[in-house]
UniProtKB/Swiss-Prot annotation, chain A:
Family listed: Belongs to the Wnt family.
Gene: cwn-2
Name recorded for this polypeptide: Protein Wnt-2
Lineage: Eukaryota, Metazoa, Ecdysozoa, Nematoda, Chromadorea
GO terms of molecular function: cytokine activity; frizzled binding; receptor ligand activity
Lipid-modified residues, O-palmitoleoyl serine kind: 219
UniProtKB/Swiss-Prot annotation, chain B:
Protein name from the UniProt record: Protein-serine O-palmitoleoyltransferase porcupine
Enzyme class: transferase
Recorded topology in the membrane: Multi-pass membrane protein
This protein's encoding gene: mom-1
Catalyzed chemical reaction(s): [Wnt protein]-L-serine + (9Z)-hexadecenoyl-CoA = [Wnt protein]-O-(9Z)-hexadecenoyl-L-serine + CoA
Domain of life of the native organism: Eukaryota
Main location: membrane
EC number: 2.3.1.250
């Protein structure tokens, strides 16, 4: 537990760095769109500070899409946290800023995973709502393209709903990486990496569509099948991306300004070409043990761990050798419920004492 | 500097653009039904063309063989298997073997084929051809029982050709329906009744086909229209999906028999969805199937005991599916549920003189109501019948929710049904045991 006096210092320091935090936490803005929608009971607010000018423009043009983007982002964050439960980096929110979603200042594997799964989440949700007919510009719209929409943008037509979600996600998310935002530095490498990982997330969703079939026939036989393509669930996407995360590829920027593979130091094997669905990163990951303002890590202090477990959630690993404190926790629950004639159920209140191990 | 310029573009591996579920299912079902409609139209004209009996027999045999090949994945294999069943059964029938022996032989052959497919990891192939073989065995058994009555001295080629034509009738091979011998020849010998009547039949058929395809779309794509909010709703949708797939088959075949000039009823979905009792559900599920079991198995009374004959009927019904534990246990469950409900309602009807039996009361010609004191119109009987209507709907969910999509093409595991029924705490069985107990008390 951080002493109370440090909270003010941290808050003050965070205010000084709010400019750089905004860049890394724009997903938090996207995830808040539905909150703004619910709170004000009006159309989503497109002036949130985390959106880039291009994204704000798309937001105005496709206001009915923004709740889907928001829910897709939230689903992705949930799945991310589920995949990394018990790990030092667990996709958690920076508690002092009150923002939603992880923050990545460095171009690490974790940043790659986060961008990929968020992109996949938005694609998934847009595609799903397309199918349900909840988005106006999905399906066979005869509306002509407005003039202020750039010419190379995809305009919703009669395409497959997954295709539409894919294109919208690409346009809305990647536009940020292509803009010259005065708020941020011109980090070409990071921008290319983000675009690459965004694309990987979207491609994984498209490639893992599977046909689902139903049998028809005499008395439960299967004389005939009717089949249709089905999207993978976010759980499946999370699992696939987790695999990609474990096998992420290190890249750097070459002289021509392109991403270039680095030799894998472990195997000394040089990959000639990365798959389109591979995740890429440029920086080594920190150990995520200590709170570090510069690298944007939260640390594992105060995390619940499992004593005696050898996995990532074990106290030895999660607490980084600092040890843990054991606390007793009283949980009240109803027990020994009996039916009394007539006519009610009477329960006793039991106090269950459990032990919780928390990292020092 | 343009940041996008340096981005290395990877080639998009575009999957083929796919329509949505409803579009794909509509296209697939219409394509299959179109092929069958071609057969129906062709044989509607063939039956009116004056050709010799010998030529007609050959036309039927070859067309049927090609139909089996056309609709199966393994063409030659399916044709050989189909004709093997025919040749063995006809040979045994001509040699005056009993219909029961031929039925048992066919079922043994079916189970042997199933084990063969299982051995070579081709269970999906067996399931794809099982429906065809089931109806085939039913027709062969019907011929066998008919031949039992025939006098061997008067057996002629004309009679034999009738049997062959009955067995090898291409429009009814894939989805059925099963027609009894009398029904088939009544249909075949029906004269051309004029363009007006034929147009009426065609319109009825097209309406049935439209309904069939609609139900197939709902069966496959119900998730597009409705997302379940609870586990019970999901189970109900699974059961509905299974039933609507069945209705698709029944209404399609209903259209075929209408086009060919028969008035045989295959199934009425409304009578099943809003059934008076589970007994009615069981008999209405597939009327031709019910006719076969009732006339060829139950009414022949192989055993003296009615209970034994009922059990034997269910056993045959189950074994016509091969060794399918899921189907066996579902049929037994339906039999048990229907039996207990019938017993209870019969007792209830007699004890309180109410018109609440499993079967509707027969209305006598000399009065407007039945013999019971509380007829259908009284409030008390109406409420009780409404309760049993709702219960029948629940039984439909209970017995149908085990037919999930994940194993339907390869066969269900042994404990699949029990696990799913366990999630409902075996409620239909509990209700049935309760009914049996109550019928002893009141």
């Amino acid at each position: 537990m951080i002493p109370r006096r440090s909270c003010w210092l941290i808050l003050l320091l965070n205010l000084l760095n709010v400019q750089s935090l905004l860049d890394a936490s724009w997903w938090s803005t996207v995830a808040q769109l539905s909150t703004a929608l619910a709170g004000h009971n009006v159309k989503p607010v497109c002036e949130l500070p985390g959106l880039s000018p291009g994204q704000a423009q798309v937001c105005e043009l496709f206001k009915d899409h923004m709740p889907a983007v928001s829910i897709g982002a939230q689903n992705a964050i949930q799945e991310c946290q589920r995949q990394f439960t018990g790990h030092r980096w667990n996709c958690s929110t920076h508690y002092s800023t009150g923002m939603l979603g992880p923050i990545h200042k460095m171009a690490t594997r974790e940043a790659a995973f986060t961008y990929a799964i968020l992109s996949a989440g938005v694609t998934h949700e847009i595609g799903r709502r397309c199918k349900q007919g909840l988005l106006t510009s999905c399906g066979c719209s005869d509306e002509t393209k407005p003039k202020n929409v750039p010419t190379d943008w995809s305009w919703g037509g009669c395409g497959d709903n997954v295709e539409y979600g894919y294109k919208f996600s690409r346009d809305f998310i990647d536009i940020r990486e292509k803009e010259h935002d005065p708020k941020r530095n011109h980090d070409n490498g990071r921008s290319l990496m983000n675009r690459r990982n965004n694309e990987a997330g979207r491609k994984i969703l498209k490639r893992h569509r599977k046909p689902k079939c139903k049998c028809h026939g005499v008395s439960g036989a299967c004389n005939m099948k009717t089949c249709w393509m089905q999207l993978p669930s976010m759980e499946q996407v999370g699992k696939i991306l987790r695999n990609k995360y474990d096998k992420a590829i290190r890249v750097q920027i070459n002289d021509r300004g392109n991403l270039q593979l680095l030799a894998d130091e472990a195997t000394k094997e040089r990959k000639t070409r990365a798959l389109p669905t591979d995740l890429v990163f440029m920086d080594d990951s920190p150990d995520y043990c200590r709170f570090d303002r510069h690298s944007g890590t939260l640390g594992t202090e105060g995390r619940v761990c499992k004593r005696g477990s050898g996995g990532a959630e074990g106290c030895d690993s999660l607490c980084c050798g600092r040890g843990y404190n054991t606390y007793t926790q009283e949980v009240k629950s109803k027990c020994n419920c009996k039916f009394e004639w007539c006519c009610k159920v009477v329960c006793q209140t039991c106090n269950n004492v459990t032990q919780v191990d928390i990292c020092k | 500097m343009d940041n996008g310029h340096g981005y290395e573009e990877f080639e998009l591996l575009e999957d083929g653009s796919l329509g949505e579920c409803s579009t794909q299912v509509a296209n697939a079902t219409f394509l299959t039904i179109s092929k069958l409609i071609c057969l129906v139209v062709a044989f509607k004209f063939i039956k009116h063309i004056p050709i010799s009996t010998t030529v007609r027999v050959y036309v039927h045999v070859f067309a049927s063989t090609f139909t089996v090949m056309w609709f199966s994945r393994n063409h030659l294999q399916s044709a050989i298997i189909y004709n093997m069943f025919s040749l063995i059964s006809l040979a045994l029938a001509i040699k005056q073997f009993s219909g029961y022996i031929i039925l048992a032989g066919n079922i043994s052959l079916l189970i042997a084929l199933q084990n063969f497919c299982r051995h070579y990891r081709s269970e999906d192939y067996f399931l794809s051809i099982r429906g065809i073989l089931m109806i085939h065995i039913m027709r062969l058994t019907t011929v066998a029982f008919n031949l039992e009555k025939a006098n061997s001295n008067k057996f002629r080629f004309v009679q034999f050709s009738s049997y062959v034509e009955y067995i090898y009738f291409p429009p009814f091979i894939i989805f059925g329906p099963y027609l009894s011998f009398e029904q088939f020849f009544k249909m075949r010998d029906k004269k051309w009744t004029g363009s007006e009547n034929e147009l009426g039949f065609i319109i009825q058929s097209l309406l049935a086909i439209f309904n069939a395809i609609t139900l197939a779309i709902i069966s496959s794509c119900h998730f597009e229209f409705f997302e379940p909010s609870s586990q019970f709703m999901e189970d109900a949708l699974t059961a509905m999906s299974f039933r609507f797939s069945h209705y698709f088959v029944c209404l399609s075949t209903q259209a075929f028999v209408l086009m060919l000039g028969s008035d045989v009823v295959v199934a009425n979905p409304l009578n099943i969805e809003f059934s008076r009792s589970t007994l009615q559900t069981v008999s209405e599920w597939n009327k031709p199937f019910h006719t076969f079991l009732h006339e060829n198995i139950f009414k022949r009374r192989l055993f003296n005991s009615t209970a034994c004959n009922v059990f034997f009927t269910f056993a045959v019904s189950s074994l016509l599916h091969g060794l399918d534990f899921q189907m066996t246990i579902t049929l037994l469950a339906l039999g048990f549920i229907a039996y207990s409900e019938t017993v209870f309602r019969k007792r209830l009807s007699a004890r309180y003189s109410m018109c609440v039996a499993a079967k509707a009361c027969p209305v006598r010609s000399n009065s407007l109501s039945c013999k019971h004191r509380h007829s259908n119109k009284t409030g008390r009987a109406l409420i009780i019948n409404l309760f049993f209507l709702m219960l029948s709907m629940y039984h439909l969910v209970f017995t149908g929710m085990t037919f999930t999509d994940d194993y339907s093409a390869i066969g269900y595991p042994f404990d699949h049904a029990w696990k799913i029924w366990g999630s409902h705490y075996y409620s239909s069985f509990m209700i049935s045991f309760l009914f049996l107990a109550l019928s002893k008390i009141i």
